[in-house]
Amino acid sequence: MDLAAIYKSLLSLSPELPSDLGETESSTSWASSGPWSLSSSDSSLPEVAARLPGRSTSLVEGRSCGWVPPPPGFAPLAPRPSSDWSPSPTSPTATPTTSSRYKTELCRTFSESGRCRYGAKCQFAHGLGELRQASRHPKYKTELCHKFYLQGRCPYGSRCHFIHNPSEDLAAPGHPHVLRQSISFSGLPSGRRTSPPPASLAGPSVSSWSFSPSSSPPPPPGDLLLSPSAFSAAPGHLCRRDPTPACCPSCRRATPNSVWGPVGGLARSPSAHSLGSDPDEYASSGTSLGGSDSPVFEAGVFGPPQPPAAPRRLPIFNRISVSE
């Protein structure tokens, strides 16, 4: 029996087979004619290239303007708005984000040559008409620049937030300028030092200091201004170097020889006479005094001698000397 006759008889006996066969043929035809088939994509490429000459396009970009049916087995997607109505980030209508320093400085190229290659897009001001006032910190240009005054130069130049020249001073009148990170030669962190120093402390004389016996020699006059212990004044009247009519009567009676006299004739610190007569006690206490290593103001240098003050000793050394 012929195979073709058997196939025809089977088709006539089963009624569902033709419908299934038709669905298969329809799905096959949809796949062959749909947008996901190779033949249709190959045939649509010349049309896209003809529509946009001189520009390379992709299959997705060429069909982005219209509706694309989903692939087999997937539900259709919701329609989205066209890309023509969505704002592009590169469009001229988009507002660029400007910096806080925009047009706050003059353009150096425009100031020197009178023209700038950036034109209206330049971030600097082309003339005083475009110059804007920058929002500065409340302490801008109110303190002295530490690096400029100690090293003679500053890496920030004109953009430094601290004062380099007196013309840049924006501080309120009556407020002294402050140098940050002041240096002390005594090894202790000192507080902020005002600049310039007072006129009364500009030139200390040798006779206005009294030195107590210590293992270290007295520092030179230049180091006395930078030591924090040099400004610890004892109770009493403080005399300046040059006698003035407003000073004490003993200063007016003093002669130049007595003002510039030798150091050995000066009164010694009370701590040198207030110690005990025991040599061991003197050796243990002499090195423990906090004020004996640096010069202090002494009352009664030019006036009448004052009674010795109480001994300046730490409590721990008092207990040690008593136990011995």
Swiss-Prot record:
Region Necessary for RNA-binding: start-end pairs: 95-171
GO annotation, biological process: 3'-UTR-mediated mRNA destabilization; 3'-UTR-mediated mRNA stabilization; cellular response to epidermal growth factor stimulus; cellular response to fibroblast growth factor stimulus; cellular response to glucocorticoid stimulus; cellular response to granulocyte macrophage colony-stimulating factor stimulus; cellular response to lipopolysaccharide; cellular response to tumor necrosis factor
Biased composition (Low complexity): 15-46, 204-214
Main subcellular localisation: nucleus
Domain notes: The C3H1-type zinc finger domains are necessary for ARE-binding activity.
Functional summary from the UniProt entry: Zinc-finger RNA-binding protein that destabilizes numerous cytoplasmic AU-rich element (ARE)-containing mRNA transcripts by promoting their poly(A) tail removal or deadenylation, and hence provide a mechanism for attenuating protein synthesis. Acts as an 3'-untranslated region (UTR) ARE mRNA-binding adapter protein to communicate signaling events to the mRNA decay machinery. Recruits deadenylase CNOT7 (and probably the CCR4-NOT complex) via association with CNOT1, and hence promotes ARE-mediated mRNA deadenylation.
Protein name in the entry: mRNA decay activator protein ZFP36
Organism in which the protein naturally occurs: Bos taurus (Bovine)
